[in-house]
Amino acid sequence: MTLPVLIAGGGPAGMASALFLIAQGVPVVVFERSEQLHADPRAATYHPPTLEMLESSGVTAELHERGLIARRWQFRDRREGLIAEFDLQHLADDTRFPYRLQCEQHKLVAMMARRVIASPLATVHHGAEVVAVRQDDDRVRVTFQDPQGVQNELDGSWLIGADGGRSLVRKSQDIEFRGFTWPERFLVVTTTFDFEPLGFAFSAYTMDPEEWTATFKVPGEDGRGRWRCVFPTRPEEDEAMLLDRDRARERLAAFVPESRAGEVVHTNLYAVHQRVAQTYRRGRVLLAGDAAHVNNPLGGMGLNFGIHDAHHLAACLARIWLGESDACLDQYDRQRRAVAERYLQAQTIANKQTLEERDPRQRAARQAEMRATAADPARAREYLLRTAMIEGLRAAAMIP
Protein backbone atom coordinates (compact mmCIF):
# COMPACT_ATOMS: atom_id res chain seq x y z
CA MET A 1 0.00 0.00 0.00
CA THR A 2 1.72 3.18 -1.22
CA LEU A 3 -1.15 5.42 -2.29
CA PRO A 4 -2.74 7.59 0.43
CA VAL A 5 -5.99 6.77 2.16
CA LEU A 6 -8.72 9.05 0.80
CA ILE A 7 -11.36 10.38 3.19
CA ALA A 8 -14.64 11.87 2.00
CA GLY A 9 -15.91 14.20 4.70
CA GLY A 10 -14.12 16.49 7.12
CA GLY A 11 -16.54 16.20 10.01
CA PRO A 12 -15.90 14.33 13.27
CA ALA A 13 -15.57 10.82 11.80
CA GLY A 14 -13.53 11.99 8.81
CA MET A 15 -11.12 14.16 10.77
CA ALA A 16 -10.79 11.52 13.48
CA SER A 17 -9.92 8.96 10.79
CA ALA A 18 -7.25 11.29 9.43
CA LEU A 19 -5.93 12.06 12.92
CA PHE A 20 -5.63 8.40 13.89
CA LEU A 21 -4.06 7.42 10.54
CA ILE A 22 -1.32 10.05 10.47
CA ALA A 23 -0.45 9.14 14.07
CA GLN A 24 0.44 5.70 12.71
CA GLY A 25 2.39 6.95 9.71
CA VAL A 26 -0.31 6.55 7.05
CA PRO A 27 -0.72 9.42 4.54
CA VAL A 28 -4.23 10.78 3.98
CA VAL A 29 -6.13 13.14 1.71
CA VAL A 30 -9.36 14.63 3.10
CA PHE A 31 -12.13 16.09 0.94
CA GLU A 32 -14.61 18.36 2.72
CA ARG A 33 -17.48 19.88 0.77
CA SER A 34 -17.84 22.98 2.97
CA GLU A 35 -15.37 25.80 2.58
CA GLN A 36 -15.44 26.46 6.33
CA LEU A 37 -16.40 24.60 9.50
CA HIS A 38 -20.05 24.42 10.51
CA ALA A 39 -20.68 26.26 13.79
CA ASP A 40 -24.40 25.56 14.20
CA PRO A 41 -25.51 23.55 17.27
CA ARG A 42 -24.87 19.85 16.84
CA ALA A 43 -23.62 17.12 19.17
CA ALA A 44 -21.62 18.11 22.25
CA THR A 45 -21.26 15.09 24.55
CA TYR A 46 -18.12 12.93 24.79
CA HIS A 47 -18.21 9.60 26.60
CA PRO A 48 -15.23 8.02 28.43
CA PRO A 49 -13.99 5.71 25.62
CA THR A 50 -13.91 8.63 23.19
CA LEU A 51 -11.77 10.68 25.55
CA GLU A 52 -9.41 7.71 25.87
CA MET A 53 -9.12 7.35 22.09
CA LEU A 54 -8.34 11.04 21.58
CA GLU A 55 -5.91 11.29 24.49
CA SER A 56 -2.61 10.52 22.74
CA SER A 57 -3.20 13.23 20.12
CA GLY A 58 -3.60 15.94 22.76
CA VAL A 59 -7.21 16.56 21.76
CA THR A 60 -8.58 15.24 25.05
CA ALA A 61 -6.45 17.68 27.03
CA GLU A 62 -7.73 20.54 24.87
CA LEU A 63 -11.32 19.37 25.31
CA HIS A 64 -10.79 19.53 29.06
CA GLU A 65 -9.49 23.09 28.74
CA ARG A 66 -12.49 24.24 26.70
CA GLY A 67 -15.29 21.92 27.81
CA LEU A 68 -17.47 21.19 30.83
CA ILE A 69 -17.26 18.03 32.93
CA ALA A 70 -20.59 16.37 33.74
CA ARG A 71 -19.99 13.89 36.56
CA ARG A 72 -23.68 13.10 36.95
CA TRP A 73 -26.71 12.99 34.71
CA GLN A 74 -30.40 12.78 35.50
CA PHE A 75 -33.78 11.41 34.60
CA ARG A 76 -36.51 13.85 35.58
CA ASP A 77 -40.29 14.08 35.29
CA ARG A 78 -41.91 17.26 34.04
CA ARG A 79 -44.37 17.28 36.94
CA GLU A 80 -42.48 15.53 39.73
CA GLY A 81 -38.94 16.81 39.17
CA LEU A 82 -35.90 14.62 39.81
CA ILE A 83 -36.46 10.87 39.41
CA ALA A 84 -32.93 9.46 39.43
CA GLU A 85 -29.38 10.78 39.26
CA PHE A 86 -26.57 8.59 37.93
CA ASP A 87 -23.05 9.18 39.23
CA LEU A 88 -20.41 8.28 36.64
CA GLN A 89 -17.86 7.84 39.43
CA HIS A 90 -19.19 4.27 39.55
CA LEU A 91 -17.03 3.74 36.44
CA ALA A 92 -13.79 4.81 38.15
CA ASP A 93 -12.37 1.28 37.90
CA ASP A 94 -13.34 1.00 34.23
CA THR A 95 -11.97 4.21 32.73
CA ARG A 96 -9.57 7.08 33.39
CA PHE A 97 -12.42 9.46 32.56
CA PRO A 98 -15.45 8.57 34.73
CA TYR A 99 -17.62 11.41 33.46
CA ARG A 100 -19.08 13.00 30.34
CA LEU A 101 -17.31 15.97 28.82
CA GLN A 102 -19.42 18.54 27.01
CA CYS A 103 -18.00 20.74 24.27
CA GLU A 104 -19.53 21.73 20.96
CA GLN A 105 -18.83 19.45 17.99
CA HIS A 106 -17.42 22.18 15.75
CA LYS A 107 -14.76 22.92 18.36
CA LEU A 108 -13.68 19.27 18.38
CA VAL A 109 -13.51 19.22 14.57
CA ALA A 110 -11.37 22.37 14.61
CA MET A 111 -9.00 20.81 17.17
CA MET A 112 -8.55 17.71 15.05
CA ALA A 113 -8.33 19.62 11.76
CA ARG A 114 -5.57 21.85 13.09
CA ARG A 115 -3.47 18.82 13.96
CA VAL A 116 -4.19 17.05 10.68
CA ILE A 117 -3.38 20.08 8.52
CA ALA A 118 -0.08 20.57 10.37
CA SER A 119 1.06 17.05 9.46
CA PRO A 120 3.24 16.47 6.37
CA LEU A 121 1.33 13.21 5.92
CA ALA A 122 -1.98 14.99 5.33
CA THR A 123 -3.61 17.05 2.61
CA VAL A 124 -6.99 18.65 3.32
CA HIS A 125 -9.15 20.05 0.52
CA HIS A 126 -11.95 22.35 1.71
CA GLY A 127 -14.65 23.25 -0.78
CA ALA A 128 -14.10 19.86 -2.44
CA GLU A 129 -17.05 17.50 -2.80
CA VAL A 130 -16.58 13.88 -3.82
CA VAL A 131 -19.03 13.34 -6.70
CA ALA A 132 -17.97 9.97 -8.15
CA VAL A 133 -16.15 6.83 -7.02
CA ARG A 134 -14.54 4.04 -9.03
CA GLN A 135 -12.42 1.17 -7.82
CA ASP A 136 -10.47 -1.80 -9.11
CA ASP A 137 -8.28 -4.46 -7.52
CA ASP A 138 -5.44 -2.20 -6.41
CA ARG A 139 -6.85 1.32 -6.03
CA VAL A 140 -9.86 3.55 -5.71
CA ARG A 141 -10.36 6.74 -7.74
CA VAL A 142 -12.49 9.66 -6.65
CA THR A 143 -13.75 12.56 -8.70
CA PHE A 144 -14.05 15.71 -6.63
CA GLN A 145 -15.54 19.07 -7.51
CA ASP A 146 -14.86 22.61 -6.30
CA PRO A 147 -17.56 25.27 -5.73
CA GLN A 148 -17.13 26.51 -9.31
CA GLY A 149 -17.87 23.05 -10.70
CA VAL A 150 -14.30 22.27 -11.73
CA GLN A 151 -13.59 18.56 -11.37
CA ASN A 152 -10.40 16.64 -10.67
CA GLU A 153 -9.51 13.02 -9.97
CA LEU A 154 -7.24 11.38 -7.42
CA ASP A 155 -6.25 7.79 -6.76
CA GLY A 156 -5.93 6.27 -3.31
CA SER A 157 -5.38 2.88 -1.74
CA TRP A 158 -8.65 2.99 0.21
CA LEU A 159 -11.58 5.38 0.51
CA ILE A 160 -13.30 6.11 3.82
CA GLY A 161 -16.80 7.45 3.29
CA ALA A 162 -17.41 9.73 6.25
CA ASP A 163 -19.63 12.09 4.28
CA GLY A 164 -22.73 12.04 6.45
CA GLY A 165 -26.17 10.48 6.46
CA ARG A 166 -26.78 11.31 2.79
CA SER A 167 -23.39 9.84 1.87
CA LEU A 168 -22.60 9.88 -1.84
CA VAL A 169 -19.87 7.33 -1.16
CA ARG A 170 -22.41 4.90 0.30
CA LYS A 171 -24.83 5.49 -2.55
CA SER A 172 -22.07 5.05 -5.15
CA GLN A 173 -21.62 1.48 -3.93
CA ASP A 174 -25.37 0.72 -3.86
CA ILE A 175 -25.24 0.02 -0.13
CA GLU A 176 -28.69 0.04 1.47
CA PHE A 177 -29.30 2.31 4.46
CA ARG A 178 -31.72 0.18 6.45
CA GLY A 179 -34.03 1.51 9.13
CA PHE A 180 -36.65 4.21 9.53
CA THR A 181 -37.28 7.91 10.06
CA TRP A 182 -39.25 9.14 13.08
CA PRO A 183 -42.41 11.08 12.12
CA GLU A 184 -41.56 13.97 14.44
CA ARG A 185 -38.65 16.36 14.04
CA PHE A 186 -36.55 17.55 16.97
CA LEU A 187 -36.36 21.23 17.88
CA VAL A 188 -33.18 22.44 19.60
CA VAL A 189 -33.47 25.72 21.51
CA THR A 190 -30.28 27.30 22.85
CA THR A 191 -30.72 29.73 25.74
CA THR A 192 -28.64 31.82 28.12
CA PHE A 193 -30.90 30.77 31.00
CA ASP A 194 -29.06 28.71 33.62
CA PHE A 195 -30.97 25.57 34.66
CA GLU A 196 -28.40 24.50 37.26
CA PRO A 197 -29.81 26.56 40.20
CA LEU A 198 -33.10 24.71 39.65
CA GLY A 199 -31.39 21.39 40.32
CA PHE A 200 -30.68 20.32 36.75
CA ALA A 201 -27.47 18.38 36.14
CA PHE A 202 -25.40 19.44 33.11
CA SER A 203 -27.15 16.59 31.27
CA ALA A 204 -30.79 15.81 32.09
CA TYR A 205 -33.65 13.97 30.41
CA THR A 206 -37.18 14.97 31.41
CA MET A 207 -40.02 12.50 30.89
CA ASP A 208 -43.47 13.63 29.82
CA PRO A 209 -46.16 11.86 27.75
CA GLU A 210 -46.96 15.03 25.82
CA GLU A 211 -43.63 16.84 25.49
CA TRP A 212 -40.45 15.31 26.88
CA THR A 213 -37.31 17.46 26.99
CA ALA A 214 -33.56 16.86 27.01
CA THR A 215 -31.37 19.62 28.46
CA PHE A 216 -27.61 19.91 28.52
CA LYS A 217 -25.08 22.61 29.14
CA VAL A 218 -22.32 23.58 26.70
CA PRO A 219 -19.54 26.17 27.10
CA GLY A 220 -20.79 28.56 24.41
CA GLU A 221 -18.56 30.68 22.23
CA ASP A 222 -17.76 33.08 25.07
CA GLY A 223 -17.17 30.34 27.66
CA ARG A 224 -19.99 31.67 29.85
CA GLY A 225 -22.22 28.66 29.24
CA ARG A 226 -25.36 28.00 27.23
CA TRP A 227 -28.11 25.44 27.68
CA ARG A 228 -29.53 23.45 24.82
CA CYS A 229 -33.06 22.11 25.15
CA VAL A 230 -34.37 19.44 22.78
CA PHE A 231 -38.12 19.12 22.21
CA PRO A 232 -40.16 16.79 19.98
CA THR A 233 -42.46 18.46 17.48
CA ARG A 234 -45.58 17.32 15.66
CA PRO A 235 -45.20 16.48 11.95
CA GLU A 236 -47.83 19.04 10.95
CA GLU A 237 -46.17 21.98 12.75
CA ASP A 238 -44.87 24.74 10.49
CA GLU A 239 -41.08 24.99 10.31
CA ALA A 240 -40.93 28.79 10.35
CA MET A 241 -43.15 28.95 13.42
CA LEU A 242 -41.10 26.30 15.20
CA LEU A 243 -37.88 28.19 14.55
CA ASP A 244 -39.31 31.56 15.59
CA ARG A 245 -37.34 32.61 18.68
CA ASP A 246 -40.28 34.26 20.43
CA ARG A 247 -42.32 31.07 20.08
CA ALA A 248 -39.32 29.02 21.19
CA ARG A 249 -39.07 31.22 24.28
CA GLU A 250 -42.72 30.46 25.06
CA ARG A 251 -42.08 26.74 24.63
CA LEU A 252 -39.20 27.00 27.09
CA ALA A 253 -41.35 28.96 29.53
CA ALA A 254 -44.04 26.27 29.42
CA PHE A 255 -41.33 23.79 30.44
CA VAL A 256 -39.62 26.01 33.04
CA PRO A 257 -41.37 29.35 33.68
CA GLU A 258 -38.19 30.87 35.14
CA SER A 259 -36.50 30.49 31.74
CA ARG A 260 -38.15 33.74 30.60
CA ALA A 261 -35.20 35.41 32.31
CA GLY A 262 -32.90 34.04 29.62
CA GLU A 263 -32.45 34.88 25.95
CA VAL A 264 -33.02 32.40 23.13
CA VAL A 265 -29.85 32.68 21.04
CA HIS A 266 -30.42 29.91 18.50
CA THR A 267 -33.05 27.50 17.21
CA ASN A 268 -32.54 24.48 15.00
CA LEU A 269 -34.88 21.84 13.59
CA TYR A 270 -33.91 18.49 12.13
CA ALA A 271 -35.31 15.17 11.01
CA VAL A 272 -34.41 12.14 13.10
CA HIS A 273 -33.46 8.74 11.68
CA GLN A 274 -32.54 5.27 12.93
CA ARG A 275 -30.57 3.56 10.16
CA VAL A 276 -27.56 1.28 9.69
CA ALA A 277 -25.77 0.56 6.42
CA GLN A 278 -26.17 -2.91 4.94
CA THR A 279 -22.37 -3.27 5.00
CA TYR A 280 -19.48 -1.03 6.04
CA ARG A 281 -17.19 -2.39 3.33
CA ARG A 282 -17.46 -2.78 -0.41
CA GLY A 283 -14.05 -3.66 -1.79
CA ARG A 284 -11.76 -0.69 -1.20
CA VAL A 285 -14.61 1.55 -0.07
CA LEU A 286 -15.30 1.77 3.67
CA LEU A 287 -17.94 3.60 5.69
CA ALA A 288 -17.68 5.38 9.04
CA GLY A 289 -19.73 7.79 11.12
CA ASP A 290 -23.12 8.98 9.90
CA ALA A 291 -22.48 7.46 6.48
CA ALA A 292 -22.64 4.08 8.24
CA HIS A 293 -25.28 4.73 10.92
CA VAL A 294 -27.62 7.46 12.13
CA ASN A 295 -29.71 7.62 15.30
CA ASN A 296 -31.67 9.99 17.49
CA PRO A 297 -29.46 12.16 19.73
CA LEU A 298 -30.85 11.07 23.11
CA GLY A 299 -27.89 9.75 25.04
CA GLY A 300 -25.27 11.60 23.01
CA MET A 301 -24.01 8.49 21.22
CA GLY A 302 -23.86 9.21 17.48
CA LEU A 303 -20.82 11.51 17.42
CA ASN A 304 -18.92 9.21 19.78
CA PHE A 305 -19.79 6.14 17.75
CA GLY A 306 -18.34 7.70 14.60
CA ILE A 307 -15.06 8.42 16.38
CA HIS A 308 -15.00 4.81 17.60
CA ASP A 309 -15.47 3.70 13.98
CA ALA A 310 -12.53 5.87 12.96
CA HIS A 311 -10.30 4.53 15.72
CA HIS A 312 -10.99 0.90 14.79
CA LEU A 313 -10.69 1.53 11.05
CA ALA A 314 -7.43 3.47 11.33
CA ALA A 315 -5.81 0.71 13.39
CA CYS A 316 -6.73 -1.81 10.71
CA LEU A 317 -5.53 0.33 7.78
CA ALA A 318 -2.26 1.00 9.59
CA ARG A 319 -1.63 -2.74 9.78
CA ILE A 320 -2.40 -3.10 6.08
CA TRP A 321 0.02 -0.22 5.39
CA LEU A 322 2.72 -2.31 7.08
CA GLY A 323 1.99 -5.30 4.86
CA GLU A 324 -0.68 -7.30 6.67
CA SER A 325 -3.72 -8.68 4.86
CA ASP A 326 -6.97 -6.73 4.60
CA ALA A 327 -8.96 -9.36 6.55
CA CYS A 328 -9.27 -6.93 9.45
CA LEU A 329 -11.53 -4.76 7.27
CA ASP A 330 -14.11 -7.53 7.14
CA GLN A 331 -13.81 -7.77 10.92
CA TYR A 332 -14.32 -3.99 11.12
CA ASP A 333 -17.58 -4.44 9.24
CA ARG A 334 -18.72 -7.32 11.43
CA GLN A 335 -17.82 -5.71 14.74
CA ARG A 336 -18.86 -2.12 14.19
CA ARG A 337 -22.07 -2.93 12.32
CA ALA A 338 -23.14 -5.47 14.93
CA VAL A 339 -22.59 -3.08 17.82
CA ALA A 340 -24.40 -0.31 15.91
CA GLU A 341 -27.45 -2.54 15.63
CA ARG A 342 -27.35 -4.09 19.10
CA TYR A 343 -26.23 -1.12 21.20
CA LEU A 344 -26.39 2.21 19.34
CA GLN A 345 -29.81 1.71 17.80
CA ALA A 346 -31.29 -0.22 20.72
CA GLN A 347 -30.13 2.24 23.40
CA THR A 348 -31.15 5.43 21.60
CA ILE A 349 -34.57 4.01 20.69
CA ALA A 350 -35.05 2.89 24.31
CA ASN A 351 -34.06 6.36 25.54
CA LYS A 352 -36.73 7.99 23.40
CA GLN A 353 -39.39 5.46 24.38
CA THR A 354 -38.62 6.00 28.07
CA LEU A 355 -39.03 9.76 27.81
CA GLU A 356 -42.30 9.65 25.88
CA GLU A 357 -44.01 6.73 27.69
CA ARG A 358 -47.76 7.45 27.77
CA ASP A 359 -49.05 4.59 29.91
CA PRO A 360 -49.09 5.88 33.54
CA ARG A 361 -48.39 2.42 34.97
CA GLN A 362 -45.52 1.77 32.60
CA ARG A 363 -44.09 5.23 33.29
CA ALA A 364 -44.31 4.69 37.05
CA ALA A 365 -42.67 1.27 36.72
CA ARG A 366 -39.81 2.69 34.65
CA GLN A 367 -39.26 5.48 37.13
CA ALA A 368 -39.21 3.03 40.04
CA GLU A 369 -36.66 0.93 38.16
CA MET A 370 -34.51 4.01 37.53
CA ARG A 371 -34.56 4.97 41.21
CA ALA A 372 -33.60 1.45 42.26
CA THR A 373 -30.81 1.24 39.70
CA ALA A 374 -29.32 4.61 40.63
CA ALA A 375 -29.42 3.72 44.34
CA ASP A 376 -27.56 0.41 43.93
CA PRO A 377 -23.84 0.89 43.09
CA ALA A 378 -23.53 -2.47 41.32
CA ARG A 379 -26.65 -1.96 39.21
CA ALA A 380 -25.72 1.65 38.52
CA ARG A 381 -22.29 0.59 37.26
CA GLU A 382 -23.82 -2.06 35.00
CA TYR A 383 -26.26 0.46 33.55
CA LEU A 384 -23.60 3.15 33.12
CA LEU A 385 -21.24 0.73 31.35
CA ARG A 386 -23.92 0.47 28.67
CA THR A 387 -24.93 4.13 28.46
CA ALA A 388 -21.29 5.30 28.53
CA MET A 389 -20.58 3.04 25.52
CA ILE A 390 -18.01 0.88 27.31
CA GLU A 391 -20.05 -2.31 27.19
CA GLY A 392 -20.62 -1.99 23.45
CA LEU A 393 -16.91 -1.68 22.73
CA ARG A 394 -16.16 -4.71 24.88
CA ALA A 395 -18.85 -6.71 23.11
CA ALA A 396 -17.54 -5.69 19.68
CA ALA A 397 -14.05 -6.87 20.57
CA MET A 398 -15.44 -10.35 21.20
CA ILE A 399 -16.81 -10.70 17.66
CA PRO A 400 -14.34 -12.68 15.50
Residue ranges and their predicted role:
Residues 22-43:
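Glycine-rich FAD pyrophosphate-binding loop
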Residues 126-140:
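A conserved short coil-to-beta-strand element within the FAD-binding core of flavoproteins
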Residues 114, 132, 158, 162-268, ...:
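Conserved FAD-binding catalytic core of PHBH/FMO-like flavoproteins
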Residues 42, 47-115, 344:
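Active-site-adjacent segment of FAD-dependent monooxygenases/related oxidoreductases
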Residues 9-19, 23, 31, 112, ...:
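Conserved mid-domain beta->alpha element of the FAD-binding
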Residues 316-400:
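C-terminal helical "tail/cap" subdomain of flavin- and related membrane-associated enzymes
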Residues 3, 148-158:
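Core beta-strand elements of the Rossmann-like FAD/NAD(P) dinucleotide-binding domain
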